């Protein structure tokens, strides 16, 4: 529940304009087309030199945009307003001239008295920020010589002009700013994403409150001016830092936050992210700290380059002595892991950088360069990275394995990348390191998670009472359907639907009793429990198709073409991995191969001693994994038949067929 100081609607409503006014701006119109004679004629006739167009562009703005010195002189002589601003962005003529890198216009406007520290709104950029983007060093020099702060900060992210120039690879202005004393190690601010999420929610609430007042609760459509007033009301939440109290979910449904903040980037980090090698060189030569980490997730320039597939930039940073072992403080990603992951980026909810395709250096070259520089081949992840995350599925990875505890070798195995695995073993990587097992409560199936959520919802009396009668009936019957037939017989469905509130408690008690009984049942795999932090998924599981039996989108992760059998053969014959090794859910490699219908790999594993009779912790045989183990996976009859022939039992529990 959100508790905030309520705002008065009047403060927002008074901002609404009473009506649109047709703007006449003949001088600005003529200036836009560069018609100097028409401008002179209009001014002689008494036209207003400062009458702006609808977007706020005045004649002086257009002179600055065009770089027309003759036009500018006429306008200045006629009394043109130096600080006139556009309606959107509040750009002054000096901002426009600086953005275009027109040094003559900038000099003239400064001579005329233009404010060199004027700010755009809401971004709060100075003319120097925009000059840095222009790439024109002379423009930058004139502004600084006139008194502009070389390390000024814009309002939104507190970025300096040097950050602007570095991020866009404006080498000339980068060098000029550095010569003029710009600090190459100043970072932008970091944003607390959790706090921002709370403020976003409050801003939306305020906007809706204002719109509701304007539209009489939806009876008519708001005008653009009214919408603007609602937006302004929402912005107040950010400026005030509204106090927000969240309703937190049960601890049983909490998971580690995978990204807490963003930002905090230096000019070097920006240049590394974009792969601007020349800018990187210039920054380092001027004292940029090569291993300075960003404020968002503790990423170095080398790691930033590797994550984004900027392998040429990574090579340059290594030549300058970047430390290959500084991992992200957020999730433990190392440059070595990032190099493998960049080559085999999964298709997640986040757009994945494709710059690796245009690099002179390949990922294997960068991996070897990192190892030669002393990279630890066994650096382990401390948290699954946020950019390998899906949404809209029964689990947060949507079928991708949880990379917590993974090494670069496990990541290469998951990509069925024999070349990367062989390179890593050459440099001493331990192929037997597995990912870390999560807490036992987080190993539930999707169905188990859904049921637990439904039971918890039924147990919340306040939320239940807020439901409609039909929703209450659905909530109770959903749990009732999973009860034993002997119990259901004494609780007729029609009675429950007629009076769900009266049956809520008794159905809930039966469900909890049943869950307690199920929890005491022995593990069908016969395996000892794996504690939290123990071994979860090993390289041989990753290379044989772990997770494919779940049928989520993430199971279609990118990997080397036709790499399943070669990868497993490498792990068994060259590394010596056990074909019967179980993952934390009790599956062996035959289970995973069966879920994909990979008969060739199944036969190889059996030839090497693989146990087709193994049963998982969920009671699934190897044949079951090929027989529609979940409703999203179609049965593969040929694989079922093969496994039965090899000795696997078949539970005949095709969930797809039901």
What does each model-identified segment do?
Residues 10-19:
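Bacterial N-terminal signal peptides
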Residues 24-29, 52-58, 85-92, 119-126, ...:
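Ankyrin-repeat boundary/"N-cap" motif
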Residues 22-62, 267, 271, 279-282, ...:
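N-terminal segments that cap or nucleate solenoid repeat domains
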Residues 612-653:
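Leucine-rich solenoid repeat scaffolds
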Residues 29-33, 62-68, 96-102, 130-136, ...:
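Ankyrin repeat A-helix N-terminal signature
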Residues 206-249, 450-525:
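Long intrinsically disordered, low-complexity regions that are acidic and Ser/Thr-rich
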Residues 35-43, 68-76, 102-110, 136-144, ...:
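Ankyrin repeat structural motif
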């Amino acid at each position: 529940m959100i508790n905030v100081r309520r705002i008065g609607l009047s403060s927002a409503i008074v901002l609404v304009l009473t009506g649109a006014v047709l703007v006449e701006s003949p001088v600005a119109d003529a200036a836009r087309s560069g018609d100097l004679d028409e401008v002179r004629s209009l001014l002689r006739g008494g036209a207003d030199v400062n009458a702006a167009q609808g977007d706020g562009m005045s004649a002086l703005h257009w002179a600055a945009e065009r770089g027309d010195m003759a036009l500018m002189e006429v306008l200045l002589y006629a009394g043109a307003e130096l600080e006139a601003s556009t309606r959107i962005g509040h750009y002054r003529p000096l901002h426009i001239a600086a953005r275009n890198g027109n040094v003559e216009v900038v000099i003239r406007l400064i001579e005329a008295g233009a404010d060199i520290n004027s700010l755009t709104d809401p971004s709060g950029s100075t003319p120097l920020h925009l000059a840095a983007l222009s790439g024109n060093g002379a423009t930058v020099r004139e502004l600084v010589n006139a008194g502009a702060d070389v390390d000024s900060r814009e309002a939104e992210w507190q970025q300096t002009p040097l950050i602007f120039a570095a991020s866009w690879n404006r080498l000339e202005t980068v060098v000029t700013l550095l010569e003029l004393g710009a600090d190459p190690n100043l970072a932008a601010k970091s944003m607390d994403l959790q706090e921002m999420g709370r403020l976003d929610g409050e801003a939306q609430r305020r906007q809706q409150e204002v719109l509701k007042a304007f539209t009489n609760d939806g009876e008519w459509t708001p005008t653009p001016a009214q919408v603007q007033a609602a937006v302004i009301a929402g912005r107040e939440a950010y400026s005030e830092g509204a106090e927000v109290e969240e309703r937190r979910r049960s601890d049983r449904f909490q998971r580690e936050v995978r990204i807490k903040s963003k930002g905090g980037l230096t000019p070097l980090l920006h240049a590394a992210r974009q792969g601007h090698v020349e800018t990187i060189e210039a920054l380092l030569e001027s004292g940029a700290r090569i291993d300075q980490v960003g404020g968002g997730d503790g990423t170095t320039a080398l790691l930033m380059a590797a994550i984004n597939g900027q392998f040429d930039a990574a090579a340059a940073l290594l030549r300058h002595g970047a430390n290959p072992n500084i991992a992200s403080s957020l999730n433990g990603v190392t440059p070595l892991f990032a190099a493998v992951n960049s080559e085999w980026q999964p298709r997640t909810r986040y757009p994945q950088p494709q710059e690796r395709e245009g690099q002179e250096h390949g990922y294997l070259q960068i991996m070897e360069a990192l190892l030669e520089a002393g990279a630890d081949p066994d650096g382990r992840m401390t948290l699954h990275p946020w950019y390998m995350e899906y949404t809209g599925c029964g689990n947060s990875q949507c079928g991708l394995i949880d990379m917590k505890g993974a090494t670069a070798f496990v990541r290469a195995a998951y990509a069925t990348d024999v070349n990367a695995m062989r390179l890593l073993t050459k440099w001493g990587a331990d192929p037997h390191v597995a990912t870390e097992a999560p807490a036992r409560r987080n190993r539930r199936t999707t169905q188990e998670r859904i049921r637990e959520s439904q039971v918890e919802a039924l147990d919340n009396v306040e939320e239940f009472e807020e439901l409609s009668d039909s929703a209450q009936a659905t909530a109770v019957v959903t749990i009732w359907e999973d009860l034993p037939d002997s119990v259901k017989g004494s609780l007729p469905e029609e009675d429950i639907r007629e009076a769900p509130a009266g049956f809520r408690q008794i159905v809930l008690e039966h469900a909890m009793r049943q869950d307690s009984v199920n929890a005491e049942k022995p593990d069908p795999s016969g395996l000892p429990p794996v504690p939290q932090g123990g071994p979860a998924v090993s390289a041989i599981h990753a290379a044989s198709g772990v997770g494919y039996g779940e049928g989520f989108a993430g199971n279609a992760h990118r990997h080397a073409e036709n790499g399943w059998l070669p990868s497993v053969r490498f792990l068994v014959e060259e590394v010596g991995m056990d074909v019967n090794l179980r993952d934390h859910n009790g599956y062996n490699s035959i289970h995973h191969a069966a879920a994909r219908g990979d008969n060739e790999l199944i036969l190889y594993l059996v030839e090497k001693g693989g146990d087709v009779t193994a049963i998982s912790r969920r009671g699934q045989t190897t044949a079951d994994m090929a027989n529609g183990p979940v409703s999203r996976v179609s049965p593969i009859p040929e694989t079922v038949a093969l496994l039965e022939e090899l000795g696997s039992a078949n539970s005949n529990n095709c969930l797809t067929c039901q």
